[in-house]
């Protein structure tokens, strides 16, 4: 494999959720450890599952992976990092300043952007700790899905320039002291990321057009900010031998080969490896060792036709239940890459076909909704909350209102404050709350961003709710977006997942997070299931067999109601293909 040749000290894996970054980064770490290298595997993903892959509680201190001599691992927990970050700033001023001032500073440091910057603080510490490179030959980062990774990797430049030019900033991060000390570290982190002798970036993708387009955007964006040493790994490719068995396998193989032959510009020039689809899920050291191994394409697997025949678990049945309320907010949540965009579009089309007025909207940074829905339908409105546009609109609004009575120095200070990366979080949230107000009169179907973003969005919603409640006190009736999200008569949250171990685990974790926020998911959609797709391919049958325990777990342990959606022979783009998902 090209990926495994002349590996520099730092290796980053990035890509959409569900493409196999964790599996490949873990397999690479095992490979290097078996070559006698000392390896540290670091996860900075809010939806981290490295511990689950190795069946080991890892946590945020370096610990050896007992099953693999030479390998150690570390997980950065963003929430814990934020707590420690707050304590570092707030503890020294307790008792020195009035309680209300201390509480105000603590509150300023409780938002989503603090969590992100705190996790990044730890990330920077690892990149700039010279002693780590005396203990380890390689440090491998299993980073978060694409949108989050881009923001994470853009932060060092954004924050170091912001701190440089804004020593007295009124940023929502509160006092800049917590960052001021690390200014040099941020600069060194940027330097390390941009140095091809020290850092290699591995883009991980599956052979699906939307995934490849997203990876191409990531490639361009990261190359622009200096990360030019990039490799591409295409994971989960169906072996040609499987295409002989039936129409579905042949269609999947054909579709993947066409995608491989027509890689987006930029990707085709990168050093590229392809990994074949595995018959088992990548959990445990022995399975991971097989992932990078060279082997024959033809798998001697038993030919059994697995067809899951449960009671009515169709997507159309789920939508018919939703339609009874005649209006409301439908939010699809889940990890990136599970098909939220497609499911949201299919649900919106079904409701519009039933005669309802529907507004379909997305805040997904990848924004491939327009690709999925290329055709128009009466009584269906499609819109996108564009993070860049919303941020600009928000900045202008703040400058025109808060900035109206400021002198020139004050205006300059406010402008600088609005250049803080956390401004985008606030702007996107405001746009989101504008859209959900419409749900009293029609159906609003919202395709939310991948897991990490979704949790940040909900955190912002909760902070807004607390602010309104504080201002209103006990007087009067009021409704905040958070109250609407918590009301099952007005909001139906659907969790979308895939019938695989890790996606189900992550969706269950997301459900637990939602329930802590007082939101109980109305149902689950299990997408891309082979177990209800009629196939005689030995490999696909083996994969279908692997799905059954996961489907049963969702049904019996997690969900009030579920829908099962099969793998289709062609990608569901366009209205007719979306209608097929309902049959």
UniProtKB/Swiss-Prot annotation:
<dbReference type="InterPro" id="IPR027541">
    <property type="entry name" value="Ars_ATPase"/>
</dbReference>
<keyword id="KW-0059">Arsenical resistance</keyword>
<feature type="binding site">
    <location>
        <begin position="334"/>
        <end position="341"/>
    </location>
    <ligand>
        <name>ATP</name>
    </ligand>
</feature>
<protein>
    <recommendedName>
        <fullName>Arsenical pump-driving ATPase</fullName>
        <ecNumber>7.3.2.7</ecNumber>
    </recommendedName>
</protein>
<comment type="similarity">
    <text>Belongs to the arsA ATPase family.</text>
</comment>
<dbReference type="InterPro" id="IPR016300">
    <property type="entry name" value="ATPase_ArsA/GET3"/>
</dbReference>
<dbReference type="Pfam" id="PF02374">
    <property type="entry name" value="ArsA_ATPase"/>
</dbReference>
<keyword id="KW-0547">Nucleotide-binding</keyword>
<dbReference type="InterPro" id="IPR025723">
    <property type="entry name" value="Anion-transp_ATPase-like_dom"/>
</dbReference>
<keyword id="KW-0067">ATP-binding</keyword>
<dbReference type="GO" id="GO:0015446">
    <property type="term" value="F:ATPase-coupled arsenite transmembrane transporter activity"/>
</dbReference>
<comment type="function">
    <text>Anion-transporting ATPase. Catalyzes the extrusion of the oxyanions arsenite, antimonite and arsenate. Maintenance of a low intracellular concentration of oxyanion produces resistance to the toxic agents.</text>
</comment>
<dbReference type="GO" id="GO:0016887">
    <property type="term" value="F:ATP hydrolysis activity"/>
</dbReference>
<keyword id="KW-0614">Plasmid</keyword>
<keyword id="KW-1278">Translocase</keyword>
<dbReference type="GO" id="GO:0005524">
    <property type="term" value="F:ATP binding"/>
</dbReference>
<dbReference type="InterPro" id="IPR027417">
    <property type="entry name" value="P-loop_NTPase"/>
</dbReference>
<feature type="binding site">
    <location>
        <begin position="15"/>
        <end position="22"/>
    </location>
    <ligand>
        <name>ATP</name>
    </ligand>
</feature>
